[in-house]
Amino acid sequence: MITLLAVTRIFPTTSMGLTTRLLVPVACVLFLVGGRVQSQDAKFWNDQAKQTLQNALNRERTLNKNVAKNVVFFLGDGMGMSTVTAARIMKGQNMGNPGEETVLKWEEFPSVALSKTYSVDKQVGSSGSSATACFCGVKANDNMLGLDSRGRYGDCASSIGAAVDSFLILAHRAGKSTGFATTSRVTHATPAALYAHAPSRDWENDGDIPTEEAAKGCTDIGAQLVENGHVFDVVLGGGRRELTGTNQTDPEYPDEVGHRTDGRNIIEEWLSKKAANRTKYVWNLDAFSSVDPAETDALLGLFERGHMHFEADRADDEAGEPSIAEMTAKAIKILQKDPDGYFLVVEGLYNDGEGSDGMPYTTLNYADGPGGEIERDSYNAVGSRRNLTNVNTGGIDFKQSAIVPREDESHAGEDVAIYANGPMAHLFHGVHEQNYMAHVVRYAACLDYKEHCQMSSAPSRDGFNLWLILVTVFLSVRFWI
């Protein structure tokens, strides 16, 4: 099984459970920390190091070269190492410890590497080009979806002959069940790279494409969810407005209509491609909760007109929407019925977030973000940074300090971490290009590189599991049996 793990509330009871919000308070770690609650003498550190050494020695004797049957790829969009470090500390502090010594679940994975994150034409890549590299195995120009470097932004003609397929499409062709779940619109840049080929990530509905480019034959991302993405068995997320017309009323917001100008209802078209008696469409929490995986072969869930709510705001949604944990669990229960295995991609949006002298300050910081305006205003008013002594840095609306004022925090250009465990995890071993990840996935699961399949033992009855954790600025990969 391959799984990419986003650092969001995928598994709320584990170390991966973080509250996702654009300004996530999880990244706010105060410099002033209380007294240590456990002894950290020489024995503590020696025992810890000996155990780590023993784990390394054991790994050398037990390299896993089996075939991965299932793949689950969790992606936390925009989550850098500052946020990961903050998550580690916060987890420990919530357990009553100092926090720094805490180990997150993926930090137990035996293989660690780094991934570069640039796109072909930009030093700091966008979600679209990053997703194309990670899912399709080739680097792309910025803001491209499912195209190699021949594709140029906004140029329909340049996309002809430049299409590249994701490993989710390849998995379907190999006879596996496939799907994705996201807290973003299902036509947003990251999930769209799983099925769409577009010279602009912004072409989410037909009205987004300039008339002259549409005349050259390009179709919008929403339409491609039917043309290419109808092969998926599970599609969960937001974005109803990109799939319905301007003459179609939204079921949750009766004063709102869709954005499509061509009159198409992509939701109905997607459903028509499936066996009606085993296919379900849901748009609220009650309907989602009533879905019986044993009686469902295909599921389309669209829980918002646009992006789904921040985790911290989800309870305020009157119609209700499932958490990313609930979507993941439901998707796996539906897909795992396939004896040939399955591929699932899970994206957690809204991780681009907030990561505090007698005046406390946050020790993990971000180059840009909304907090930059607050710091600027403080210096202009009193000549120094803001004093966080009486500020609730764990509050839902706290804005983390930043250098450059921006409406939200952006992607960064530094390398990101890769953590791996399971079949072929040892192939992550140094500093890699971003597109290398897709090739390891395809190799481990025998989607191509067929010589591996011939040399490796066949998957067991229960299958081998490959877990991958990717976050635009942080990647972790897990493979296990």
Q: Where are these predicted regions, by residue range?
A:
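Short glycine- and acidic-rich boundary segments immediately preceding or forming the N-terminal edge
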Residues: G17-L57, R173
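Surface-exposed patches in mature extracellular/periplasmic domains of secreted proteins
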Residues: A163, T178-S184, K450-M455
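His/Cys-centered metal/cofactor-coordination and adjacent catalytic loops
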Residues: G146-G161
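A post-motif C-terminal structural segment
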Residues: Q40-Q54, N64-N70, M79-C136, N141, ...
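Cleavable N-terminal signal peptides of Sec/SRP-targeted secreted and luminal proteins
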Residues: T3-R9, T19-R36, W467-W480
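A conserved hydrophobic secondary-structure block that centers on an alpha-helix together
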Residues: R173, T178-A181, T187-T190
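C-terminal GPI-anchoring signal of eukaryotic secretory precursors
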Residues: C453-W467
